[in-house]
């Protein structure tokens, strides 16, 4: 089995690198690719860089070079739900752009032409993750994760997003782009995000303080997922 894992920044992949055997590194442009194994699984861990374009490039490279059975996007997110606190986990059912608007042409808010409005994560992987999260007592929510090329750090931005996507529980800068590429190439994907900040006026300082916590939590869940999959050798 071959699994691609994508994280935007070094903190989000550092702990994952530690569990990969025979670790090797290569670069394509500014994108770092770590290859190796975890038990019987071939791992392709990509440091994508921040934002939708970087995430899209990294996902396309992963699929074209390595043909993974599925892709994991691991890292941090801002909370849009009062129940989600620092270190809590989001296991999204689906993801959507909050900064795309072609509604004047009859498309739904967030929808790219020729694509669905939302991109759904793989149900089997999602259910496995939920079982693991319950077993190991992670606090988590499932729902809609929204993506855009801005770090949300103001309460009025939260209000605007929630007015347009009332069911959104979190916000990030990469996941929907990864979902769109996976949809295009028919590759299953799953998202594991841990809350680093509350997307409010204190978001910048909270992110800087809490990114180690969020990265540790999301990486731990990735490791547990890999263990589970390696033991059953299927999804």
Curated annotation (Swiss-Prot):
Cellular component annotations (GO), alphabetically ordered: cytosol
Q: Which Pfam families match?
A: PNP_UDP_1
A GO molecular-function annotation: methylthioadenosine nucleosidase activity
The record, for Gene3D superfamilies, names:
Nucleoside phosphorylase domain (3.40.50.1580)
- Name the active site residues: 12 (proton acceptor), 197 (proton donor)
Which is a GO BP term held by this UniProt record? purine deoxyribonucleoside catabolic process
- S-S pairs: none
**Can you state which reaction this protein catalyses?**
S-adenosyl-L-homocysteine + H2O = S-(5-deoxy-D-ribos-5-yl)-L-homocysteine + adenine; S-methyl-5'-thioadenosine + H2O = 5-(methylsulfanyl)-D-ribose + adenine; 5'-deoxyadenosine + H2O = 5-deoxy-D-ribose + adenine
Family named by the database record: Belongs to the PNP/UDP phosphorylase family. MtnN subfamily.
Subunit structure as annotated in this protein's UniProt entry: Homodimer.
Protein purpose? Catalyzes the irreversible cleavage of the glycosidic bond in both 5'-methylthioadenosine (MTA) and S-adenosylhomocysteine (SAH/AdoHcy) to adenine and the corresponding thioribose, 5'-methylthioribose and S-ribosylhomocysteine, respectively. Also cleaves 5'-deoxyadenosine, a toxic by-product of radical S-adenosylmethionine (SAM) enzymes, into 5-deoxyribose and adenine. Thus, is required for in vivo function of the radical SAM enzymes biotin synthase and lipoic acid synthase, that are inhibited by 5'-deoxyadenosine accumulation.
Q: Tell me what this protein is called.
A: 5'-methylthioadenosine/S-adenosylhomocysteine nucleosidase
Q: Which gene encodes it?
A: mtnN
């Amino acid at each position: 089995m071959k699994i691609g894992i994508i994280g935007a920044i070094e903190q989000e992949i550092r702990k994952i690198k530690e569990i990969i055997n025979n670790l090797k590194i290569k670069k394509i442009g500014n994108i770092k690719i770590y290859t190796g194994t975890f038990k019987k699984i071939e791992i392709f861990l990509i440091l994508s860089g921040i934002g939708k374009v970087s995430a899209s490039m990294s996902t396309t490279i992963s699929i074209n070079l390595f043909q993974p059975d599925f892709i994991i996007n691991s890292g941090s997110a801002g909370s849009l739900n009062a129940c989600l606190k620092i270190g809590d986990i989001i296991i999204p059912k689906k993801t959507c752009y909050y900064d795309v608007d072609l509604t004047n042409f009859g498309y739904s808010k967030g929808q790219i032409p020729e694509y669905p409005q939302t991109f759904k994560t793989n149900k089997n992987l999602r259910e496995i993750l939920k079982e693991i999260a319950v077993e190991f007592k992670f606090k988590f929510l499932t729902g809609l994760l929204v993506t855009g090329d801005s770090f949300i750090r103001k309460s009025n931005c939260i209000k605007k997003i929630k007015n347009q996507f009332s069911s959104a529980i979190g916000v990030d800068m990469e996941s929907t782009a990864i979902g769109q590429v996976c949809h295009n190439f028919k590759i299953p994907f799953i998202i594991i995000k841990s809350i680093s900040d509350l997307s409010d006026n204190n978001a910048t300082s909270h992110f800087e303080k809490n990114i180690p916590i969020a990265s540790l939590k999301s990486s731990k869940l990735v490791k547990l997922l890999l263990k589970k999959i390696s033991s059953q050798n299927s999804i």
